[in-house]
């Protein structure tokens, strides 16, 4: 069994619409990854522009596919706000995991006590070079509208974009560990 699932779920027009929605209605996040001393942004780990989307119709379009493709049978109870990532020339996200086994603390509101169980990334365009999504030394995403679904504990990265702009939509399904 592979560590990820990939499938075409959105049309190119739907992807273009998501990009526009994110740029116009998304909530921009200014800072990304801070260094180990929590002082400043560490762009050597991640350099990208981020917009959070909490659009109900977007969840209704994507989540049935996530549920259907969940071959690991994770029991998740919440989905974090979707994140539009804009990677311009030179932008990247170094090797990381989306969940390190430490549950969200009480300051996380409805996510308190939960962990990221399942991660997904949807490629929204192909008009860029570099910027490959890498998981287990495989470059699985290469078509607009493809979703990549994988356990949140698997290491992955986005290589630096060398030309153009890469757009992706990512999300995380959260729940209690070992359920």
Region spans (language model):
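Fe(II)/2-oxoglutarate oxygenase catalytic core
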Residues: 1-147, 153-179
